[in-house]
Amino acid sequence: MGETLDRQLGLLRSQLVYRAIPWRGAQLRRFYRRFVPAGGLAFDVGAHLGNRVAAFRQLGARVVALEPQPDFVRQLQRRFGGDPGVTLLPQALGRAPGRARLMVSPRTPTVTTLSGDFIERAGASPSFKGVSWQAGPQVDVATLDGLIARHGQPDFVKIDVEGFELEVLMGASRPLPALSFEFLPAMRDVALACIDRLEALAGPGHYRYAVSMGEQLQLLRPQGEPADALREWLHALPHDGPSGDVHAWGPGAGSGTRR
């Protein structure tokens, strides 16, 4: 009974956060227009309630949406199940195919994760005070390479996986045109390792990088900067500073047109 109530409260909380602002959809479309071209393909890794999925579809792209949490898979199926332009996959991504145990946070489902390191380190941060996790279901895990082989090369990949970002990128063997991944100052080493992975995949200097903070949907340096500048910026963040997303794009991407 208590666990069911916690899950219902968590779902309601997510709905209030992601759907209660009537103009948020327009903000999302404006923000992602440069990365998601009409007629393109976007992967939403960690789709949650699908606010990014909806924005990508409204921009005219096909979407492959991955979400391993059963409650949110059901919500996504209700919302997008009849849309032939959306492929819903109830699974996670990692460095190798297989199965893994979700660690769920019923009252704060946005921080459900596959990363035990995330629970230990982020959970000790003051901003996570009161957040708790428990063992959830076993879920299927695929790779970016497998996803690309099945669905095609994406124009943009959004990665929101609570400390598992590097594991997702380790499942790719070739550069992605454009992508974003979440960072947390308490775990900045994961973000730094993600940058190293991208630079290794594409070669030094291939990507430009820019950060957006929280849900502000605004790049701090829209023109982007090289990897070393972003590394320096991440190192300077206070330990309990706000989270955000790193955006990276290569030549020909980030212009709002198909490659």
What residues fall within each predicted segment?
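Phosphate/nucleotide-binding beta-alpha loop and adjacent structural elements of enzyme active sites
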Residues: 1-259
